[in-house]
Amino acid sequence: MTWSVFRSINTPTLDLSTALRSTRTPLVAAGVGCATFAGVSLFRMSSRSPPFASLSVSASSVKKEVVSTEKAPAALGPYSQAIKANNLVFLSGVLGLIPETGKFVSESVEDQTEQVLKNMGEILKASGADYSSVVKTTIMLADLADFKTVNEIYAKYFPAPSPARSTYQVAALPLNAKIEIECIATL
C-alpha cells in the first residue's frame, strides 16, 4: 500500500467493484492513518477524537521522581541514576564501578558484570523495586564474545521468567567499561 502525506498517489487500479459495489478506483492514500481504497474510506472522519489521540502523553500530567543512592556509583554526566514515573522506574546505564572509589572493580567482564548487577540492585532498592520487578533490560557489551559469560552471571540475578532483554555490542562504553546495563522495572 502506498502512503503519502497530503497528496494522492496513483497506483495500478484494482477491480473490487463486485465486492464493494464501486467502480474501478485507484488506490489512494492521503495523510497518515487514513486511506481510500476502491472508493471506501478506511478511516471514517467524524466528530470523535483524531486517530491515535489516546496514545498522546502529556508531560505535565506525569509526576517524575529522581532516585539516588550513595550505595551505587554517582552519575557520570547530567543524568539521574533512575527516575520513577507512572508506577515504573527507569534505571540509567549502570557500570561496574565501586561506589566508594568510582573505579572499576577489575578489568574482567565477569567482575564488572557482577558489580553492575549489584549496583543495579542498590538503585532498584532505593526506588522501592527489586530484581523480580524488572521487566526489560538492555545490555551493552564492548565485545559480543563476552555474551555467554554475561548470560551465566545474569541468570543468577534474573531467574525464569527473565525480563525482556536486548543485548548489543557497541563501539565504546564510558571509561572503557566492558559492560553497561540499563533497565525498566515496575513499582
UniProtKB/Swiss-Prot annotation:
Pathway: Amino-acid biosynthesis; L-isoleucine biosynthesis; 2-oxobutanoate from L-threonine
Alphabetical UniProt keywords: Amino-acid biosynthesis, Branched-chain amino acid biosynthesis, Chloroplast, Detoxification, Hydrolase, Isoleucine biosynthesis, Plastid, Transit peptide
A Gene Ontology BP annotation from the UniProt entry: branched-chain amino acid biosynthetic process
Binding site for substrate: R165
Pfam families according to UniProt: Ribonuc_L-PSP
Molecular function via GO: 2-iminobutanoate deaminase activity; 2-iminopropanoate deaminase activity; deaminase activity
Reaction(s) catalysed by this chain's protein: 2-iminobutanoate + H2O = 2-oxobutanoate + NH4(+); 2-iminopropanoate + H2O = pyruvate + NH4(+)
EC category name: hydrolase
Observed phenotype of the null mutant: Reduced root growth and increased sensitivity of the root to added Ser.
Tissue-level expression: Expressed in leaves, petiols, petals, carpels and shoot apex.
Site for Important for catalytic activity at high pH, residues: E180
Stabilizes the substrate (site feature) positions: Y79
GO cellular component: chloroplast; chloroplast envelope; chloroplast stroma; cytosol; plant-type vacuole; plastid; thylakoid
Transit peptide, start-end: 1-58
E.C. designation(s): 3.5.99.10
Places the protein is found: Plastid, Chloroplast
Sequence similarity: Belongs to the RutC family.
Function: Hydrolyzes the Ser-derived enamine/imine product of Thr dehydratase, protecting the plastidial branched-chain aminotransferase BCAT3 (AC Q9M401) from inactivation. Involved in Ile biosynthesis.
Name recorded for this polypeptide: Reactive Intermediate Deaminase A, chloroplastic
Organism: Arabidopsis thaliana
